[in-house]
């Protein structure tokens, strides 16, 4: 494990090559995958539930009579998971609810003289679809992170799709999370076919207004394909963490945090930017020690070799500059007073301050959303929030007197733009 992770001196050619490799790691879109996804979407649009059942048989090796999860199945799921897990999920849900409730925006109205009234209405979307990866790899945290903000936003109906396990049932931890989070309907459908069903509807599954949730490359391509017919949250890239630390950082903690993201997949990037040469050696030793006890050891090691890096810089301010260029999904600041640097962080999905605010805390429990922009998109994108589940409409009312007061001005602008019918719409009211 000698070359466990690359070490880069800031300003070197190695650094430039490394950052270029991060940009290129997802590669080009696969034409065969795009073709397959298009075929699946068209098939679901044409054949509805029949296509869903056939794809479940083909891809999940499960023969289903019905794709809808029953109330009895949801009730039975509670007996199949530990009480401690249920308790933990309830606490997480409460924290996520509390955090997201602060994001709620209210409608407003402005009244002016001469009978002018204008304002904005804010209302939840009618129907939202949540995609949750299923099978043996269950992620109940994805359920609550997507469903709770939708619920807080006032979404009328939340529909969830997730592939069944080999026994034809949905993973019980997923069902419990969905029930606690207030999901209204759950269907045993996965892959691109689930996205197609949510986007266009079938005999059983309602067409939704927005689709959220993570998935594999087929799910991602399907979401991209249906965007415009429905809204989507984002196309997520590989997981990322960038840790900024000085010499006071605990190497055990830093090594553990870097590996927590590396275990996602071999394209994940784990980066430490530090001012301390001594810390580098200690972190590498800790990685070697800790990785031996981890179930996803091979994935972690490959991710660290492929896209991991430790960058030596001469100051924390330079480390922050690098962080702002990378615009990582997760950014940790491990210094004696991390709050002094908070306002300097311009580009990051979520920021974790101090030694006892590790990234997995945000994944599961604290309250901020774990659905975050990746691949540098934190430069212009934000974490999933209540705002993603609402729509806003503006409205206005002018009395005759109010319109007469601005009549000439409106006409002048319309005529300058050459839109005479616009101008006529105003003029005709005062002839």
From Swiss-Prot:
Its EC number is 1.1.1.23. Signal peptide: none annotated. Zn(2+) binds at residues 261, 264, 363, 422. Transmembrane segments: none annotated. The keyword Oxidoreductase applies. Its cofactor is Zn(2+). Keywords: Amino-acid biosynthesis, Histidine biosynthesis, Metal-binding, NAD, Oxidoreductase, Zinc. The active site is at residues 329-330. It catalyses: L-histidinol + 2 NAD(+) + H2O = L-histidine + 2 NADH + 3 H(+). GO terms for cellular component: cytosol. NAD(+) binds at residues 131, 193, 216. GO terms for molecular function: histidinol dehydrogenase activity; NAD binding; zinc ion binding. The keyword Transit peptide does not apply. It comes from the Bacteria. Binds 1 zinc ion per subunit. Substrate binds at residues 239, 261, 264, 330, 363, 417, 422. Pathway: Amino-acid biosynthesis; L-histidine biosynthesis; L-histidine from 5-phospho-alpha-D-ribose 1-diphosphate: step 9/9. InterPro entries: Ald_DH/histidinol_DH (IPR016161), Histidinol_DH_CS (IPR001692), Histidinol_DH_monofunct (IPR022695), Hstdl_DH (IPR012131). HAMAP family: HisD (MF_01024). Belongs to the histidinol dehydrogenase family. Catalyzes the sequential NAD-dependent oxidations of L-histidinol to L-histidinaldehyde and then to L-histidine. This is Histidinol dehydrogenase. It comes from Clostridium acetobutylicum (strain ATCC 824 / DSM 792 / JCM 1419 / IAM 19013 / LMG 5710 / NBRC 13948 / NRRL B-527 / VKM B-1787 / 2291 / W).
């Amino acid at each position: 494990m000698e070359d466990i992770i690359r070490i880069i001196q800031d300003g070197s050619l190695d650094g430039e090559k490394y950052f270029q490799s991060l940009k290129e790691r997802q590669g080009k879109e696969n034409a065969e995958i795009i073709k397959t996804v298009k075929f699946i979407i068209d098939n679901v649009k044409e054949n509805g539930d029949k296509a869903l059942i056939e794809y479940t048989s083909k891809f999940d090796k499960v023969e289903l009579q019905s794709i809808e999860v029953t109330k009895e199945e949801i009730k039975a799921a509670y007996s199949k998971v530990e009480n401690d897990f249920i308790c933990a999920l309830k606490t997480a849900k409460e924290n996520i609810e509390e955090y997201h409730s602060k994001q709620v925006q209210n409608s407003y109205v402005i009244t002016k003289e001469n009978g002018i009234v204008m304002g904005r209405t804010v209302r939840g979307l009618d129907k939202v679809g949540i995609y949750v990866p299923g099978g043996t790899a269950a992620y109940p945290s994805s359920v609550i992170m997507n469903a709770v903000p939708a619920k807080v936003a006032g979404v009328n109906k939340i529909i969830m799709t997730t592939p069944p396990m080999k026994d034809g049932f949905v993973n019980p931890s997923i069902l419990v999370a969905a029930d606690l989070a207030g999901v209204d309907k759950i269907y045993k459908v996965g892959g691109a076919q689930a996205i197609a069903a949510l986007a266009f509807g079938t005999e059983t599954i309602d067409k939704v207004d927005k689709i959220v949730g993570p998935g594999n490359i087929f799910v991602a391509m399907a979401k991209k394909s249906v965007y415009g017919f429905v809204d989507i949250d984002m196309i997520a890239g590989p997981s990322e963490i960038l840790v900024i630390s000085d010499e006071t950082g605990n190497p055990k903690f830093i090594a553990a945090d870097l590996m927590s993201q590396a275990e996602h997949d071999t394209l994940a990037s784990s980066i430490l930017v530090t001012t301390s040469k001594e810390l580098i050696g200690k972190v590498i030793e800790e990685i070697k020690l800790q990785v031996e006890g981890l179930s996803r050891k091979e994935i972690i090691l490959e991710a660290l070799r492929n896209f991991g890096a430790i960058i030596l810089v001469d100051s924390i301010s330079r480390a922050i500059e690098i962080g702002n260029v990378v615009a990582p999904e997760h950014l940790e600041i491990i210094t004696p007073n991390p709050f002094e640097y908070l306002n300097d962080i311009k580009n990051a999905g979520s920021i974790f301050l101090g030694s006892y605010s590790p990234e997995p805390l945000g994944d599961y429990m604290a309250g901020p959303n774990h659905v975050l922009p990746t691949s540098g998109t934190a430069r212009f994108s934000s974490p999933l929030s209540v705002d993603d589940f609402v729509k806003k409409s503006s409205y206005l009312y002018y009395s005759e007197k109010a319109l007469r007061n601005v009549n000439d001005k409106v006409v002048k602008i319309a005529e300058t733009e050459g839109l005479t019918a616009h101008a006529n719409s105003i003029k005709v009211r005062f002839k």
